[in-house]
Amino acid sequence: MEVRRNDIVFVKCNAMVPNGSVQCFDRPAIVLQNNKGNANSPTLIVAYLTSQIKRTDLPTHVVLQHYPGLCKKSMVLLEQVDTISKDDVVEVINHLDTEDVVKVNNGLLISLGFGEVA
């Protein structure tokens, strides 16, 4: 299965035990890794989505537009960046539109301590 940056994918979670706010259930995620890495690596860098829309004031929480394939309104948790095996991707659900790509990129820069771009 080909996976590209900014794809919305459904991921099966292989985490052993829930721990606080760590995401560990099967859920959608956004592929953050560049396409060269996506093509050549057995792993992917992703940020998880949640349907629990909370703390929208945080710059690392990006509420998405409606996307076919997502059952509920969703928010990207850019403080929940994870490296997963490509084998954990069940399917590609959709792809972010340009407006949401900009929001996710800004939230990721803030999450990693690089600031925000205009």
Enumerate the language-model features and the residues they cover.
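Conserved functional hotspots at enzyme active or ligand-binding sites that engage polyanionic ligands
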Residues: 1-118
